[in-house]
């Protein structure tokens, strides 16, 4: 399977350009650094064709807080990657690498209380949106 060029955003560190195999198994392993078990990788849309790949259950696995993305504290290591119009993973362009390296350059620190409160806020907001349907 092909490899794609992505940005790795680890807790407490600056972003690093790296390669990932473009498979579900590789994605699951990549987002499970520090977890007891292999997690389930999921994506969160940042922009039109830019996504983050992260461990949805990172909070439950007590992974450390990393960065805040669209109002949600992401726990554990996550990756920034591109997607084609057909939603297939693709490499970031040099411009995208520069842009997202700058965006996530400064490490952020969160307490367990911050992470739990944020998780509850995100859950509440999701429930409010569901009620509107």
Predicted regions and their residues:
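Short beta-rich binding modules
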Residues: 1-133
